[in-house]
């Protein structure tokens, strides 16, 4: 990852230390080694199948459909779920995994021949991508990391994978490779931290999406779809 340029770092940190009423500590500072770390014990030792069970249970609580399939069945599973959501237009990011998981025929042949519009995110198109996402009925993306505990999919945004794909369409479908499922936020943070340590290019935006958009006021009246899709579904697929 390219290193950025930091300006006025010392002056900024010295000012904070001064306001705290102490001298700035610039040496001998280490990350605390906490004795109690219960976050690592949640679902510790669970198999991928057991984590799928945890994910499935929580999806019921967040009003999200969960479908399980393999690579061969993914084409039909996505087609059928899209039909249950009312069909297209469909918005997708530019992602080679659609081809790798055997979905090219659906996206470039079957749906277009049926009159269903399929729009792929195009970095060169600028704001036109956002307009298409607003018009789309379904947004489809792959989950990078999936949190079983909360039913959350983690999305890495980039120039080819705009956040609007999963935010602006009326409904949303996440394709969840089974290997991406981890117990909770603890493991997701560790994965991202390791990517940084390895020098990988880090996404411009990392989003944690938990089912459809849900909002509630002080009277506990649930309102769905205010800040995102009205409905959501996860398709858990065995890895290739």
Curated annotation (Swiss-Prot):
It comes from the Bacteria. It holds the Pfam family LUD_dom. InterPro entries: FTHF_cligase-like_sf (IPR024185), LUD_dom (IPR003741), LutC (IPR022823), NagB/RpiA_transferase-like (IPR037171). One of its GO terms (biological process) is lactate metabolic process. Gene3D superfamilies: NagB/RpiA/CoA transferase-like. Is involved in L-lactate degradation and allows cells to grow with lactate as the sole carbon source. Belongs to the LutC/YkgG family. This is Lactate utilization protein C. It comes from Bacillus licheniformis (strain ATCC 14580 / DSM 13 / JCM 2505 / CCUG 7422 / NBRC 12200 / NCIMB 9375 / NCTC 10341 / NRRL NRS-1264 / Gibson 46). The lineage of its organism: Bacteria, Bacillati, Bacillota, Bacilli, Bacillales.
